[in-house]
């Protein structure tokens, strides 16, 4: 599992690379890394499993975090999530 960090104010603070992993693995990886960003910061998950487009926003609603956006990539998408608590 790769994680990259960025300074505050320059997009997601952490990106979790889940390309090539099938759901629910991207969500499990997100949940395991979410505590690494401060409350109010954005974490990104890159994934290419088509189920991630529905599963990640649903997980955000269930866990009461903010689903910010889905950005298409050459392979899959980047899902941005704001940590709310």
Where are these regions (language model features)?
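C-terminal structural segments of small proteins and small subunits
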Residues: 5-6, 57-85
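A residue-level signal for beta-strand positions that form part of recognition/binding surfaces
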Residues: 13-15, 78
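Amphipathic, hydrophobic secondary-structure cores in small proteins
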Residues: 16-71
């Amino acid at each position: 599992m790769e994680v990259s960090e960025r300074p505050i104010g320059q997009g997601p603070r952490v990106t979790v690379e889940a390309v090539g992993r099938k759901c629910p693995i991207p969500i499990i990886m997100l949940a395991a890394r979410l505590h690494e960003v401060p409350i109010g910061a954005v974490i990104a998950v890159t994934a290419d499993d088509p189920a991630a487009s529905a599963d990640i926003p649903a997980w955000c609603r269930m866990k009461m975090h903010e689903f910010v956006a889905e950005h298409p990539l050459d392979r899959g998408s980047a899902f941005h999530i704001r940590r709310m608590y």
